[in-house]
Amino acid sequence: MENKSKYKTIDHVLCVEGNKKIHVWETLPEENSPKRKNTIIIASGFARRMDHFAGLAEYLSRNGFHVIRYDSLHHVGLSSGTIDEFTMSIGKQSLLAVVDWLNTRKINNRGILASSLSARIVYASLSEINVSFLITAVGVVNLRYTLERALGFDYLSLPINELPNNLDFEGHKLGAEVFARDCLDFGWEDLTSTINSMMYLDIPFIAFTANNDNWVKQDEVITLLSNIRSNRCKIYSLLGSSHDLGENLVVLRNFYQSVTKAAIAMDNDRLDIDVDIIEPSFEHLTIATVNERRMKIEIENQAISLS
């Protein structure tokens, strides 16, 4: 279902099993922009909504890309469910549902851009979906390490019955038992499991690390890439960045520029990101961000009025 609105961004609603709904936002290529072969799917990081990536969608659209974003089930954002029931497997289910929807629309040429925790979900999903290339930014490769750094304790080391009810992650209450049980039962938790998922990757892959990232070890990202049997992988560092790519405007702009260059390069079957881009003005980025926040509020208000 497509929700018509006055905004540039198009809101779609996917109905999935259990009468749940996934909201997908579509941004069309800017008029008269360069022609691109691939659509870009943006998989937001944990506790990040679609509208947090308004600026990146604007960068990609200005440079000719058709952009798809979505809010996972049981997460922050517009889709069904609450974050206290989120698991990595639910994140994977949400991604696969979006890809299935794109298949029904005959949108088969696509690259994925995933950040933080969503990168780990994408790594585990690549054997089940067809994509042209993968870009990750501060992508989690060792979930156990990242959780320990973020939460201050290695909760995955505890027996299930000794876990607290909730884990406080950046102000959000993550259901400890359901999340930990899913991690351990389905092998999400360590670097080895990530390597096993990615070993036979045969598509181009660019990984952006941040040199001040305390949640993801750069040497573990390098270890992951060294275990991929393809030679079509490359790592770049976002200098001056921490795991929070939006911590200030300089870091954020570097992130937008870098991944846009990577998308253009990979759309042209290259790993060298020394390419020119069209850069939106600060005014255009501000307008896009404000409009998407308004659109989100309107959608939330419509949902409340219908309930």
Curated annotation (Swiss-Prot):
Name the enzyme group at the top EC level. transferase
User: Which Enzyme Commission number(s) are on file for it?
Assistant: 2.3.1.-
| Name this protein carries in UniProt | Acyl transferase
Please name the HAMAP family in this protein's record.
Answer: LuxD
Query: Which Pfam families does UniProt cross-reference here?
Result: Acyl_transf_2 (PF02273)
Question: Which InterPro entries did the record assign?
Answer: AB_hydrolase_fold, LuxD
Q: Which Gene3D superfamilies match?
A: alpha/beta hydrolase
Entry similarity comment: Belongs to the LuxD family.
| Task of the protein | Acyl transferase is part of the fatty acid reductase system required for aldehyde biosynthesis; it produces fatty acids for the luminescent reaction.
A Gene Ontology annotation in the biological process aspect, one of them, is: bioluminescence
Q: Which residues form the active site?
A: S116, D213, H243
Top-level division of the source organism's lineage: Bacteria
As one GO molecular function, the record gives: acyltransferase activity, transferring groups other than amino-acyl groups
Record key words, sorted: Acyltransferase, Luminescence, Transferase
Q: In which pathway does it act?
A: Lipid metabolism; fatty acid reduction for biolumincescence
